[in-house]
Amino acid sequence: MHRFITFAAAALSLASCSRAADAPGCLLVPSGYGPEGQVPIRVERVASGLEVPWGLAFLPDGDVLVTERPGRVRLIHGGRLLGAPVASVPVTARGEGGLLGIALDPRFAENRRFYMYFTRAKDGRDVNGVARFTLAADGRSARQDRFILDDIPAARFHDGGRIRFGPDGMLYVATGDAREPPSAQDPRSTGGKLLRITPGGAPAPGNPTPGSPVFLSGLRNTEAFDWLDARTLIVADHGPSGEMGRSGHDEVSVARAGDDLGWPDVWRCEAARGRVAPALVFREAVPPGGGSMYRGDAIPAWRGSFLIGILGSRHLHRVALGADGRVAAHEVYLAGDPPKGLGRLREVVQGPDGALWVTTSNCDGRGTCPAEKDVVVRIVGG
């Protein structure tokens, strides 16, 4: 699996002033951008008036659930955003925390279940957790059943939050290091990891360490991952922003079960024994939001590419890999703030209609919030 992952230099490496050699297959991009994209595309507005829409879930009847970071679940019905929330959950919506990822149960058509990752106060501290919900038959309300995974480290920044069901039917949960870099290397911590659990919340069978939910380690703050094939992932991760004197170097990497992506021990394109080197590194901070592999027909030239929403440098980034797993091409679309571009991009996911669906994050306190607030759009061929 290819991943965007930023590696920071280890404290030991800093102390000895040594630097690991660069991995030969890693592409270092000197800026936070890339070549201008050449594929004609068209952007269609689906909904506006949202507040930091973080995740999308497509229902079998064509409706779409949208999470808003302040704690609301909204419904797009018949192409229109309904006013009343489907559900509201109590969250700690400060910094990067709040209501984040959402995923439908693989058996949703039978059980109406979906899952959400969010930050909340518990016993005098903030934690992240994954809770299971059941959607009413009319789709207008939902009830919370129970937490299937709880006490994931939380902080003002680095909360991770993307959740997706894999081709194996297991739930994959991306967590942040909660501003405690060593947690990413601590097998006892669920921080700074990609976790793999059953729909009931137990560590999934076949995990690298029996009885542990940890599938990948060495992550800093991942919001984007998808599958290249049934056993290989592509992951995007945020690089350091001052830890150990390091900054920038957001990454895309390819990984498999048990891999260590290196944070905080290595960073940039460095190769190190027992660590997976990234495929692509941005020298200047991007950083990446959500991302997905595109396999649809609406934009044939993008098929087989990893599309990433870029927050800081405000664009959509396409990454194409060659048969050898190295970056064959990468390019930029929709750069800049509206009306030229879309601004800060958060969720990027292929819809059942074959279009690429994208949410903006211009009202998260780090962008310019327009009068229409944040939007949901679909992207098709031009």
List each language-model region with its residue ranges.
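Asp-box/WD-like beta-propeller blade repeats and closely related beta-sheet repeat scaffolds
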Residues: 127-164
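Beta-propeller domain segments
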Residues: 22-33, 97-99, 107-109, 177-332, ...
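Beta-propeller domains
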Residues: 65-87
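Blade-loop segments of beta-propeller domains
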Residues: 82-106
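Beta-strand-rich domains and repeat architectures in extracellular enzymes and scaffolds
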Residues: 44-71, 287-293
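Generic structural signal for coil-to-beta-strand starts
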Residues: 63, 72, 113, 170-172, ...
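Surface loop/turn motifs at the tips and blade-to-blade linkers of beta-strand repeat domains
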Residues: 45-51, 86-94, 148-155, 213-217, ...
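Conserved beta-strand position repeated across blades of beta-propeller domains
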Residues: 47, 54-57, 103, 164, ...
